[in-house]
Amino acid sequence: MKLQLIAVGTRMPDWVTRGFEEYQRRFPRDMALELIEIPAGKRGKNADIVRILQKEGEQMLAAIPKGNHIVSLDLPGKNWTTPELATALTKWQLDGRDVSLLIGGPEGLAPACKEAANQSWCLSALTLPHPLVRVVVAESLYRAWSVNTNHPYHRE
């Protein structure tokens, strides 16, 4: 199974890239973690945020291979504990499809992305900077994998 993180934004700070890659390399070959970056629309004083979100959403949806299970990261989503995420990861594996996880930009996800999602995951009730979300999601997925495989990374 492939876990595909589709995120708005390119040119992340070095610590974000290093953090994401640290967890990405820990995954086994049979559960690869891939990152697809979508260029963020130009924002400014007079920017049309609705149009920017729409364009970002179109690009995100175009990056999803047909048949993938889609999970949006969004505040109204489900708050998962680590064991609940591990259970979700097992269900995704048993489903036999690859999984695309969608991370929006500063204003969140486009409505079309939310509508296309099979599931919605609320990472935190806190407002997190979208670059940090990449690292937290990668670590959370790795931790869930470690729970499922009895790897010593996760400790109760």
UniProtKB/Swiss-Prot annotation:
Domain of life of the source: Bacteria
Binding site for S-adenosyl-L-methionine: L73, G104, L123, S124, A125, L126, T127, L128
Entry keyword Oxidoreductase: no
Compartments, as annotated in UniProt: Cytoplasm
Chemical reaction(s) catalysed: pseudouridine(1915) in 23S rRNA + S-adenosyl-L-methionine = N(3)-methylpseudouridine(1915) in 23S rRNA + S-adenosyl-L-homocysteine + H(+)
Keywords, ordered alphabetically: Cytoplasm, Methyltransferase, rRNA processing, S-adenosyl-L-methionine, Transferase
EC number: 2.1.1.177
InterPro entries recorded: Alpha/beta_knot_MTases, RlmH-like, tRNA_m1G_MTases_N
Family: Belongs to the RNA methyltransferase RlmH family.
Record's function text: Specifically methylates the pseudouridine at position 1915 (m3Psi1915) in 23S rRNA.
Protein name (database record): Ribosomal RNA large subunit methyltransferase H
Species annotation: Shewanella baltica (strain OS155 / ATCC BAA-1091)
